[in-house]
Amino acid sequence: MAAPAPRARTGGKKKDERRGFKGYKWEFRDSNKDFWAQGHAECKSLIMILLIAAMVCFQRVATHPIVILLLTMELSICAFFFFLYSLAINRYIPFVFWPMMDLMNDLACSTFLIGGIFFALEARRELPVPYLTGMILMGVTAFISIIDLCLQRRQFKSRKLRKFILLTPDRKGKKQDPKLLLMLAAKEDEEERQRELAEKAKRESMDPGW
């Protein structure tokens, strides 16, 4: 009697399915999905467009170099975060909590731009139309930065913070057990389901015709 054929091992395939280029493609799609669905990509795109338009307006007239330097700095930082999320580079640097860095950048961007408006106002006595247009664009950019800052609150939910803590390696560079993340997610899903059932029972008790 012939010996039974050995079973194919599928565990290694599942383990390695997110490595290499296929893994990067998955991270690329998932990162861009979150980046665009949460509104950060739209805000950063508008910020970069407005900053470029403001620089063009200021370069048409005599402008203090500090104003141009400020706009160039903010444009560079915004472009850095845009390509960081678009190319999924943040997924491969897990020891940095990028939402916190992005929040600090939005706060600094709005603060510097508002300060730059007052500085540009004091730098000239006469305000030509291109100069005034650049100041208005700086104000709109600061407002959009505040909107992007408010959108960051979704990243600071307890579930995402716990996920980040579990994915962060320890001092020796070793990552935590991935089973802890699965157990935590299952527990939170069960708590959410119990909460929904309790709310449904409460509505039924208040409305007999429910």
Curated annotation (Swiss-Prot):
GO molecular function, one term: cytokine activity
Recorded topology in the membrane: Multi-pass membrane protein
Cell location: Membrane
Swiss-Prot/TrEMBL keywords: Chemotaxis, Cytokine, Membrane, Transmembrane, Transmembrane helix
Protein name listed in UniProt: CKLF-like MARVEL transmembrane domain-containing protein 2B
Record carries keyword Transmembrane helix: yes
Alphabetized InterPro entries for the sequence: Marvel
GO biological process: chemotaxis
GO cellular component: a single term: membrane
Domain MARVEL: 35-157
Protein family according to the UniProt entry: Belongs to the chemokine-like factor family.
Entry keyword Mitochondrion: no
Transmembrane segments: 35-55, 65-85, 103-123, 127-147
Highest rank taxon of the organism: Eukaryota
Naturally occurring in which organism (per UniProt): Mus musculus
